[in-house]
Structure formats: structure tokens, C-alpha cells
Amino acid sequence: NWCGYTSMYIDITPYATYGDDVNTIAVRVDADAQEGWWYEGAGIYRHTWLVKRSPLHIITDGVFAHPVKKTESQWEIPVEVSLYNSGKLTADGEVEVTLLAPDGQPIATKNQKLSVKALREGIANLPITVTKPLFWSPENPVLYKVKTQVKQNGTVTDEVETKCGFRTIRFDNNTGFWLNGENIKIKGVCSHQDHAGVGVAVPDALWEFRLRKLKEMGVNAYRVAHNPVAKEFMAACDSMGIMVLDENRLFNTSPEYVRQLEWQVRRDRNCPSVILWSVFNEEPMQGTENGVEMVRRMYDVVKKMDPTRPITAAMNGGFFSEYNVSQAVDVGGFNYQIESYDCFHEENPDLPLTSTEDGSALMTRGEYVTDYSKNLMDSYDTQCTGWGATHRRAWKAVAERPWMAGCFYWTAFDYHGEPTPHRWPTVSSFFGIMDLCGFPKMAYYLHQAQWVKDKDVLELVPHWNWPADSIGKPIKVMALSNADKVKLLLNGKVISEQAVDPYEMNTWSVPYKPGKLEAIGYKNGKIVSRTKVETTKDPVQVHLTPDRNSLAGDGRDAMPITVEVVDSKGRHVPTANNMMEFTLTGPAEIIGVGNGNPNCHEPEKGNKRSLFYGLAQVIIQSKEGSGPITLTASTPGLKPATITINAEQVPPIPSIAAENPPMLLNRWVASPLSTEKPDATRQIADNDMNSWQPVSGGNLIKLENANFVILRATFNPYQAHQEEGGSILFKQLTGKAEIWLNGQLIGSKTTDKEEDFTVEFPAAKERCDLRVLLNGTTGEAVGLKGNVTVRTKRMIP
């Protein structure tokens, strides 16, 4: 597999050995070559499954069950099931699909018999008709299930449940985007896949945490940039109601990359959240005939597998070239280029358009002064890249154009790498609406005020903890609200009242005076919202806030816990930077720490992290089992905080534990038989293939007119063996035996019976010469009936 973002499936049946033989799965990861220009991470960072299947089975992602509207009241799910027969003979079976309502009740069932030849695929088509289903939407993400079973002789041999949703989508050249017949604006974000403390190895629960923060901000769509994401992320978008622009990693039409594209479409085409495919991001060939031809071919690959969704390409140039890829897609995709929106629309009035990436505004959470010498960006939405726009300008450009379907802001969260516009020692980006931990920046409340309609929003920035020499000096104050107007007060005195500008929001210049800065929001002349920032006292106590009250004790569930300090009145101190130390007891472990500071070089693994503008995060993950989990956070001079979270007993997730790979010794040679006891330490030439004969485990040696035989094998010790020795396990060793290693007797078996036998050996720095001197009665069989493995004393990291 030549992509770090796509899955691969390998049938290991031809390579597996059975019984006591050792099967070792080794995966070599080579991350020398970059796929992206951000910090991508490396290794096996998503789930890996060992799957046992019947010979006739449903292939992975082999059920296509995406509903299609037929009439105003009638829908069809053209269920297509792909089977594979790994057996040696033709297999006959029956495929049964059942549509389950959101409450689990069966709605309809279809059956089809089919016969699949050995090592071939078979396809069953079982269309299901549905009348007046409930619709999937961001506000009400209703999911149905298609249960698919394979039966042979009345017995279920394979079963898969596939979630799906009923919804219609349409991109219109004049009116933008329509979902279920309703004209809505896409309010989207882009993001990479890493989080503070864990990098790209993000636990499933953290995906839910991140998406929940976005939903609260008013987001209804997410562009997976610029690669396929984890399957669990897509499932969370389905269940939480977040539409997805599903983008591939590499723009290439060679067979390997077409295979990757096919895998992505096959995996995600059942997701109701997916509203649009994107076949590339900002490719240099976007304004060339070659680029058009490549997109045409990728377009065809996608449409063959999913004819129901439109396709775009995220262009950042080439829009006005004679040949450009907008000519080969269903929806034109703009990355930035705000100034070209109107001209392009005039020249291409029949092409639906969306912004596929915009913004690239820059902020440091908690900072309110830009200082390039310190790699700091202010939080007033004044800074952006040369190619981008501020949050306010970018949204206004989309919101005021009805033919523009929507936007996808760069980015939802900060991410490791790409510290534009700075360089080292900055180690993460400034683009995020939230920081690496998911702590909101000012932009979060700005978009919440612009996008949330079902609740009142009012936030004030900045904090009100300024040094004494700031008294009397003007402080820029912003109110972020969806009210009609906002009144600002300082220490009870009205400063002014302003009508809310839904794009620019409201700004004041307020001479600093310690105390309480308060904002009041009005709609239709009535107070609908209040908020305040206060000058706090010095911190006196640490405070911990868990994201949830419990963890599933499955060894996978995880949660972020917010760390802060409060003053004597329990108020958050927004300027604190105390170093925190964490201790944890119970069935859990700390898997990461962070604070959202793009210039911080503290380790993201361990039990310490400083606050950054009053906040830090510690991420814990459950172990298997149940019981109380207790976390304590402390810092010198302040009262520590302790919380207890319960790990709940849940059914264990089927898994195979990672073990030390035992070294299998399977290249043995046997000496000539003898009636007298031979010298087990005598020199033997490695190339002596005349007097010594190859033997294998499982085959005993009959002592014809003899009583002794020597078995010999050599091996190069692992590093752990070199440092502290190990053990050798003989499975079903038959006959009396002396075990010699490098000329030293390390163990003796004194019985003739067949049994497992283990010997320990000391640290061995060089190549090891292992000999087994076997002794038995003439005419009996002795030897290695099972395998022989060399094991370490500890886990190899």
C-alpha cells in the first residue's frame, strides 16, 4: 500500500500455518517520503483487525445500500452485495437483506440465491422499496440499517450491518445548495487529522469530541483535507449530522492511485453525510489539458461506483485557462480567489459553485497583540495569509452570493506542522478556529454568532486581566453576537450601544480599568443574552473539568480533561501559565497532554504540561476493566484538584494482544545415529550436508540400532537476548534430552515422555549454536514433535 491514508486488506490464508506453528505478522512502515506538506505522523495509527470468515463471505465494504428517490413518496435502496468464495469448490448460498427502521424494527426483506465459483466474486442485487422514510439532515440525522446475511444450508455464515440515510442533495447554479428540498448554506470547515498529545493516532471518542465542538459552533459540513479519514470519523459524521466533502489524497490516474480512489468511494458511498466528492486539492495541472483529461478519468471512476453524488476539484488557480478542470466536474470548487467569484460565475453561469477552502486567517489563542518577533498572532481577526482572507471577509463573500453553495474554512483546528507565516521554533499552525486541544479562539465565537440561529450567542473578547501599567490605556473590545444590538458596560457604566453587524460584529476602544466588563444583547427591544469578563484575583486552586462523567472500560475509550486554575471566587484565571503535574490511579492511563501553544516544546507524552493562557488538556484512555479512575492535578503554591471518573464494565472488544514475536527455529540438522553418547560440543562445519541431514519439527527420528542423536540449529539473538538472555520453548519434546547452547549445558530433560520443555539461557552477544542431545531406547522415536521458539523476557518496544 503506497498511501498512509488508505486501508489495505490482505488475505493471509495461503500464508498461515496451523496447530502450534507460530504466525508472526510483521508490517514495515516507510515514512521517508512525504505525502503532505504538514506534519503527518507515521506508523499504524488507525484500527487494525484480524478477520475470520467463512469461505463464502461478504467482501470488506461489499454492501452498497445508498437510497435513491423515485417519486415524491417512494424511495428505493438498490442493495448490491459483493461476495467472495475463498474455498476450493463452487459454493451455493442465499443472500438476505433486511431494512431496519431507526428503532430497529424490520421494514422489508429481500432474498436471492446465487452460486459463486472458487476464488471468484459474485454479486447479488436486491432492491428494496420504501415509502415516506424519515429524512437525514444535520438537525435530525436519522439513520436506517441494512442487515445483510449470507446463508448456507439454513445457517448464517456471514453478516454485516450497513447504516444509510434518506436525503436528497442538489447543487444549483443560481441558488446554491439544497438539502431535502430546503435551500441552505454550507457552513463548513477543513481540517487535518491530528490532536494535541496523540498526534494522528486519535481515539474514536476524540473524533466525537471534536465534531461536537464544531456542531456547537454552528458547523454543518466538514471537508476531509486532503485525504480519506478514519472510518470511525465518517460514522460519527453520519450519526451527528455533519455533511462531508470527501477528498482523496493524490491526483494520479495510474493503476495504484485509481485503486486508492476506488477504495475510498467503496468505503464511503453509503454514508448519508457525504454530499460531494473531491478528486484533488490545488494541483499544478488544474489549468491544463492534461489536468482535464486526468480529472475526466477520475470522474469516471467515481461515477461508476457512485452515480448519485456530484464531483468537484478544489482549484486555487487556472480558472480562466482555455482548458481547466472546472470543465470536467459537476461543481466548481474555489480555494480562496474571492476576487474571482463574480467574474468566473459570469463566464460560467451554468456551473454550480462552492468555496472548497477559504479563510487562512491566523490567530494565537489568548493573544491580542501581533508580534512577529515572538511568532504571535492577535485574536481580533486582523491577520491572514497573502492568499487568504480574514474570517469576516471570507464569510461575507460567500453569504452575500446566493449562487455560492457555501464555504469550508481553513481550518477547524490547529495542527502540527505548517506554522505559516512563521518558522521554527513554532511547531504547529495558527489557522485553527480552535487550537490543537480544541479550545476555542475568538474565531469560534465569531462563527457561532454568524451561524447559530436556534440559540442566543454573545461573547466578549479580550479577557480583563491586564497589568497595572495598562490602566487608562485603550483596549480593543469585540462583542460577538447574533442579537440585533449590544450594549457594553464597564463597572456598571454604559459605554455605548451598537447595532450588530452580522459580518463585522462590534468593536469598541475602552480605556482599561479593572473590574467587570459586561455586554447585554437585545432582540426586538428585549434582553436575550448577557456575558461578562472580570478582573480576577491571583489563582488559588487547580480545577479539572472532564468531557464526560464515565469511560467505557474497553481499553479504547478516551476523553480530554480541561485543566485550569481559579481564584478565591472560583473564577477562571485567563492569564495563568502554571506548570501542572498529573497523577492517575485506576484502570486508565494518560495518553497525551497539550495546551494549544504553537510555540511550546514541552513533551506531549508524560504527566506534566504548563497552562497556556489559563488552559491545558490531559487525555486519559481506559484500560480493560471497571472501577474508579482518579486524576489529580497539582502545581506548587496552589490547592490541587482531584476528580474521579468511573470506568464502566462493557463487553470486551474482540482483539489479539500484541506479543513479543517469538523466534521460530525451523532449520534443524540431525547427526548420524550412534549407540554411544556423542560429544555435544564438538566442532561441526556449517556446510557439512553429508553426515548431518536436514530435519523439520513434527517429524520424530526412529533410533534404529542406536540410542543417541544430536539436533542442531543456529540463530542470531535479538537485542533483548543480547542484553538479558531469554528462554527456549520446546513443544512436545520426545525422549531424554540435554540442551546445549554455545558449548554450555543449560538444561536437561530426564523423562522419555512427550512434553513441553522450557530452558532459560543467559545473555548471548553473538550467534548462538543450539544443540539437543537426545537419548532413547533402541527402536523408539525421539525428537521435536512440535515447534521450537526462542522468547524474550520482556516486551520489545
Predicted regions and their residues:
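Extended substrate-binding grooves/exosites of carbohydrate-active enzymes
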Residues: M8-P14, Q34, H47, R53-H57, ...
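Short, hydrophobic beta-strand segments
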Residues: P14, L126-F135, T507-Y512, E604-E624, ...
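Accessory carbohydrate-binding/adhesion or oligomerization-edge regions at the termini
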Residues: V22-D30, L50, P102, W395, ...
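Beta-strand-rich structural segments
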Residues: P78-L83, Q149, I475-S481, I520, ...
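Accessory beta-strand-rich segments of carbohydrate-active enzymes
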Residues: N1-D61, S86-G87, P102, P228-K231, ...
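Non-catalytic, glycine-rich low-complexity segments
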Residues: A16-Y18, V22, A26-A91, K163-T168, ...
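Short flexible loop/turn segments that cap and initiate beta-strands
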Residues: A91-E96, P138-K145, P474, N482-D484, ...
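Extended acidic/polar, glycine-enriched regions
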Residues: S82-D172, M505-G515, K523, V533, ...
